[in-house]
Amino acid sequence: MSEANDYSYNIASVEKTIRLIELLAETNGELSVLQIAKRLDTHASSAVRFLITLQNLGYVDKCEQIGKYRLTDRLLKIASNLIVSHPLTVRYLDVMHTLAYNLNATTHIMAFYGLSTITLHKDLQTQNISYNNAFFDPKRQHYCSAPGKLLLSTLPEEQLSEYLSGLKFIKYTSTTITSEKELRENLELIRHVGYSVHNEEWLSGCLTVSFPLRVYGEIRGAMSIMCSIERKDEILSPETLSEIKRMLAEPDV
């Protein structure tokens, strides 16, 4: 991810428009003009002008029955275009489907953004509903997730310490990591071996292995492979791991 520009001047109207879009996305459009104005720390008349502009551009709809606003599917169209042209899609989508077929496993491509993992693609080869739902459970924490731990392993110490300072460990299963010391040791292992493992730490019966996805040498996301824990020895065999790493290796530039 590119660094923010050092240029310190922001256009206030653009900044407020982006904040408005983010606000509507967070609340699913359940806000009135007065609520929006309060959240944006602006006058109601200003909030109305921003909303009308976004309506005219096709980004916002108003429910006349309740007088509240929501985002339209136009943003979904933009997101869809972004996913199609995303470098992780261009470079790794075919590999994801190939791995799912070859290993008879569920596979996911996730992008990393800050402390977030964003699912771009999935191939539910195993057709396991629990495996699918596990990736989208809002209660799930990075410390008990293979892609989450992989993300944590890439953070500089300052960001990792900030994450840990607000973390409350919960023991979901008998193998869940429950201390900072144990987590840091696991992250160091991930950096050493080049992949992360979910060993029933969140979902019993599930093995997940996540590998870093690089774009121009920078880790931008993860390829995750999910299957039954009974296949642990097979998936974590040196031969299988080596082949997966070979398939995910970034070509020489």
Language model feature labels by segment:
Residues 70-166:
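Amphipathic alpha-helical effector-binding/dimerization core
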Residues 39, 93-102, 193, 250:
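Amphipathic alpha-helical regulatory segments at dimerization interfaces
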Residues 60-62, 109-110, 213:
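A structural signal for short hydrophobic beta-strand segments in well-ordered beta-sheet cores
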Residues 10-14, 33, 68, 72, ...:
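Short, structured helix-loop boundary elements
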Residues 25, 152, 156, 245-253:
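Short amphipathic alpha-helical signal-transduction/dimerization elements
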Residues 2-83:
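N-terminal helix-turn-helix
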Residues 175-249:
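Extended hydrophobic
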